[in-house]
Amino acid sequence: MAKKVANIVKLQIPAGKATPAPPVGPALGQAGINIMGFTKDFNARTADQAGMIIPVVITVYEDRSFDFVTKTPPAAVLLKKAAGVEHGSGEPNTKKVAKVTKDQVKEIAETKMQDLNAADVEAAMRMVEGTARSMGFEVEG
């Protein structure tokens, strides 16, 4: 018989840097998760993606055991890395802060494909381009 799900926790944590300190510790503690067990597993699983923010969905069962699934980094984080900037524009319609090429957008769309609700790469590219424009990035090509 399948275990009963008690709670689902969604967090965005820097890869390889989960610690019991806030905000991770309190969120996991409220859900009844073994905090040290989760942080060790998460850090081991994401050690190769250093510098990225990794969304994670933690499923907590009634017996206080848990499973977690890591997702691909948010499109905004991948776009900032591709453009080489710290943050997007405060006024994206008037002030452009960076440029990204269609090739960079396609690469990000292919990376994000498994997490996006898109039928093909072109649809995923349009989603990523929309994110880029809303951050004040210019899409070339």
Curated annotation (Swiss-Prot):
One of its GO terms (biological process) is translation. Forms part of the ribosomal stalk which helps the ribosome interact with GTP-bound translation factors. It comes from the Bacteria. The keyword Translocase does not apply. Keywords: Methylation, Ribonucleoprotein, Ribosomal protein, RNA-binding, rRNA-binding. One or more lysine residues are methylated. One of its GO terms (molecular function) is structural constituent of ribosome. Part of the ribosomal stalk of the 50S ribosomal subunit. Interacts with L10 and the large rRNA to form the base of the stalk. L10 forms an elongated spine to which L12 dimers bind in a sequential fashion forming a multimeric L10(L12)X complex. GO terms for cellular component: cytosolic large ribosomal subunit. Belongs to the universal ribosomal protein uL11 family. The keyword 4Fe-4S does not apply. HAMAP family: Ribosomal_uL11. Gene3D superfamilies: Ribosomal protein L11, C-terminal domain, Ribosomal protein L11/L12, N-terminal domain. The gene is rplK. Pfam families: Ribosomal_L11, Ribosomal_L11_N. This is Large ribosomal subunit protein uL11.
